[in-house]
């Protein structure tokens, strides 16, 4: 196996020679006549491009654990060529700088190729079961070369940094300070990347040592597997028999599972049918409940309507009682009118009977005339004319009868209007009677008040007379004081008071006489009103009897209707009880069905779980057998290889 150092050196020499020739010719032909400022700009652009490319390549190297390699002769040549005297920048120096930078690019390419080789060798090591000592030595050599080339690359970068620092310190007028700082930062980043790459290389070395240790262990295990291979052949045959047996058992289990799946599908269909029946029963129950509720509401409404009807009947009975009281007062008048109407009706009925008899006679005559028509047409014509005249006479009589009927109808209308007037008069008389009663009560109260006032007046009169008698006595005893004018004035005043009291007494007596006359008139009116009230009371008693009879009849009807309603309610209650018993029975059946369904579902779920468990067990056994068979196959293949 060739070492990579010789190939890298040859490639680097050829590349540097060709690059030097090409760059020298190009630079001398193109830039000899141009200014130094243009050269510095070109170098700046070229350096930035190179640094960017180096940064990307270093990132790739860090991801793939790459490193660079270069020869020591190349390093010495770079050192000798890069130590320039500190002078002004010339065209030759720029050309040498460009060549050196291109040499570093070539070195980076060679490092990439070396990294790819190292990667391939590491993959081969990882894939191979046995690793030779030559490969291990080759890996260690390549690792040493990588370390050396990384150091050389770092040294080259240091030289370039020193050169660039000297160059940019001399040419600060041409190049901006910002680009220099950017380049320095990029160089620092590259140094950091190199340090990280070194750490990764150390880690990879430790991993390679671990891999070598593992390879040695695998060799030991291979020796042991050769010893075990003989025992595995017998086990392989035995396992093949077991596999065949398990395959037959699996087929049987599959058939059982299929049969169980068919049974489960049938049971599921039965469960669905039972659920449908349950839903149907629930719908029936809800429908029957709604029907019962509706019937109960209808019966309630009927009872409420019946109660309203009863209340209306009571109000109507009360109204009828009042109307009967009014009608009873007008019955006598109505009876007279009715008797007259009956007489006219009887008279009209007699006339109608006579007319019907005449019509029947005329019909008989018409029949006879029809029979005699064949004998004499002329006689028939004369008779027909006579009949027409008689019919006209009868039509006139019918018109008269219609007029009399219309008159009777008008009379009935008048009678009805008179009845209404009589009712109104009766109501007015009732109102007047109530007013008279109120007036009588007021007059009685006034009489009581007047009697009390009269008694008070009499007591006052007695007191005044007693006072007068006492004063007369005083006057008799005190005659000797009459000479005095003051006593005279007092006597005059007392006499005036007495006269005023007498006038008041006379007025009171006159007023009492007037009140007594009014009371007598009012007593007469009261007697008359009492007589009228007694008559009305009798009428009211008769009306009350009639009303009581009507109320009894109404109560009988109400009791009958109540009995009917009670019988209907009892029937409804019986129906409700029967329906409730049916509902209870259906609910019990529903509960039983639910319990059976739950038990069936539980058993079904338990069976499914058992089947799944058995399937999982069989699958795990099959997998273990397959894994063991695979292990045997691999072990046999490794042994025979």
From Swiss-Prot:
* Keyword Transferase carried by entry: no
Q: Which InterPro entries match?
A: Odf2-rel (IPR026099)
Subcellular location, record wording: Cytoplasm, Cytoskeleton, Microtubule organizing center, Centrosome; Cytoplasm, Cytoskeleton, Microtubule organizing center, Centrosome, Centriole; Cytoplasm, Cytoskeleton, Microtubule organizing center, Centrosome, Centriolar satellite; Cytoplasm, Cytoskeleton, Cilium basal body
Q: Which residues form a coiled coil?
A: 83-144, 191-270, 299-375, 487-599
A GO CC annotation given for this chain: centrosome
GO biological process, alphabetically ordered: cell projection organization; negative regulation of cilium assembly
Superkingdom in the source lineage: Eukaryota
Q: What are the entry keywords?
A: Cell projection, Cilium biogenesis/degradation, Coiled coil, Cytoplasm, Cytoskeleton
Name the protein family. Answer: Belongs to the ODF2 family.
Q: What does this protein do?
A: Acts as a suppressor of ciliogenesis, specifically, the initiation of ciliogenesis.
What is the protein name stated in its UniProt record? Protein BCAP
Q: In the UniProt record, what gene is named as encoding this protein?
A: odf2l
């Amino acid at each position: 196996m060739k070492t990579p150092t010789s190939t890298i050196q040859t490639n680097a020499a050829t590349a540097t020679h060709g690059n030097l020739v090409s760059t020298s010719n190009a630079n001398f032909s193109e830039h000899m006549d141009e200014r130094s400022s243009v050269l510095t700009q070109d170098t700046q652009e070229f350096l930035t491009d190179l640094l960017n490319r180096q940064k990307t390549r270093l990132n790739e190297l860090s991801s793939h654990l790459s490193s660079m390699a270069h020869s020591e002769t190349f390093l010495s040549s770079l050192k000798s060529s890069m130590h320039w005297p500190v002078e002004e920048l010339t065209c030759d120096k720029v050309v040498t700088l460009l060549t050196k930078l291109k040499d570093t690019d070539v070195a980076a390419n060679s490092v990439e190729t070396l990294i790819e080789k190292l990667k391939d060798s590491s993959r081969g090591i990882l894939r191979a079961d046995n690793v030779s000592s030559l490969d291990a030595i080759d890996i260690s050599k390549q690792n040493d070369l990588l370390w050396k080339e990384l150091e050389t690359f770092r040294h080259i970068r240091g030289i370039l940094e020193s050169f660039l620092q000297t160059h940019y310190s001399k040419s600060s007028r041409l190049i901006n300070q910002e680009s220099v700082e950017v380049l320095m930062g990029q160089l620092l980043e590259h140094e950091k990347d190199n340090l990280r790459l070194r750490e990764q290389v150390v880690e990879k070395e430790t991993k390679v040592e671990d891999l070598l240790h593992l390879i040695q262990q695998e060799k030991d295990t291979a020796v042991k597997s050769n010893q075990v291979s003989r025992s595995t052949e017998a086990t392989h045959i035995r396992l093949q028999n077991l596999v065949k047996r398990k395959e037959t058992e699996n087929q049987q289990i599959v058939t059982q599972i299929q049969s169980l799946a068919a049974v489960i599908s049938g049971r599921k269909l039965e469960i669905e049918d039972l659920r449908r029946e349950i839903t149907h029963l629930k719908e029936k129950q809800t429908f029957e409940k709604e029907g019962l509720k509706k019937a109960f509401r209808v019966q309630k409404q009927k009872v409420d309507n019946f109660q309203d009807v009863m209340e209306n009947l009571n109000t109507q009975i009360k109204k009828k009682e009042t109307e009967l009281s009014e009608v009873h007062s007008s019955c006598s008048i109505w009876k007279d009118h009715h008797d007259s109407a009956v007489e006219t009706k009887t008279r009209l009925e007699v006339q109608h009977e006579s007319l019907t008899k005449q019509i029947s006679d005329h019909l008989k005559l018409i029949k006879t005339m029809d029979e005699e028509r064949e004998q004499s047409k002329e006689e028939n014509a004369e008779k027909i004319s006579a009949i027409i005249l008689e019919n006209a006479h009868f039509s006139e009589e019918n018109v008269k009868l219609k007029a009399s009927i219309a008159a009777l109808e008008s009379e009935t209308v008048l009678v009805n209007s008179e009845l209404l007037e009589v009712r109104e008069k009766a109501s007015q008389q009732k109102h007047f009677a109530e007013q008279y009663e109120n007036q009588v009560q007021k007059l009685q109260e006034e009489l009581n008040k007047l009697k009390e006032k009269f008694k008070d007046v009499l007591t006052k009169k007695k007191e005044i007379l007693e006072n007068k008698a006492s004063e007369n006595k005083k006057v008799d005893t005190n005659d000797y004081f009459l000479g005095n004018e003051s006593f005279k004035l007092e006597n005059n005043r007392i006499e005036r008071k007495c006269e005023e009291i007498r006038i008041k007494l006379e007025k009171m007596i006159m007023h009492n006489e007037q009140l007594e006359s009014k009371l007598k008139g009012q007593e007469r009116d009261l007697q008359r009103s009492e007589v009228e009230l007694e008559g009305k009371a009798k009428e009211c008693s008769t009306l009350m009897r009639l009303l009581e009879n009507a109320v009894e009849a109404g109560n009988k009807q109400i009791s009958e209707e109540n009995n009917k309603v009670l019988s209907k309610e009892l029937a409804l209650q019986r129906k409700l009880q029967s329906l409730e018993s049916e509902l209870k029975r259906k609910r019990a059946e529903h509960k039983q069905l639910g319990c059976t369904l739950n038990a069936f579902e539980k058993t079904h779920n338990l069976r499914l779980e058992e089947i799944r468990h058995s399937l999982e067990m069989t699958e795990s056994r099959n997998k273990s057998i397959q894994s063991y068979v695979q292990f045997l196959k691999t072990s046999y293949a490794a042994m025979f290889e």
